[in-house]
Amino acid sequence: MKRALHIGPLVFRDPVLLCGVLYVLLWFDASGFLRLGLCAAFLHEWGHILVYWAMFRTFPTIEVTLTGFCMRTRGRSMTPQQTFWLAAAGPLTNVLMAALWAVRLEQEATIRGSAFWAANLLTGAFNLLPIPPLDGAQMALALREALRQRNQGLQFLRKSGKIKRMKKR
């Protein structure tokens, strides 16, 4: 039986196991690279949250599990364009952070700085894979739906006589 702890819009799935595993992993993370990866993942999700807030002026429900964070948008009606930009916000945040960090690395290159840069690039690139439930799959589905709606609109306009099919030369 899975337990959940609700704190405002945050939902922690199986919080005792989550905290225990996180504690052990951070205990053995002498290099600090896990912390940098977690920071990149947090920034990624924060990008989604900011765009969601900008669209709807409310915060989404955020589920925290052993596999990471995820935003629940069930019950929220969104256009394909909104869905696309909401999904793209996380990877764009990671790319923006990597670009800012690259400028910083030109001035003073450090191992941790390079690791943070790489963590952001890898987090953004991984989430662009078109595999559900990753952002790339959400973006592809939203793009497909937008094209389908556009084609339906064009077909309606052709049938109603508002526009005519162009002849090939």
Which positions does each model-derived feature cover?
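Hydrophobic transmembrane alpha-helices and their immediate loop junctions
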Residues: 1-169
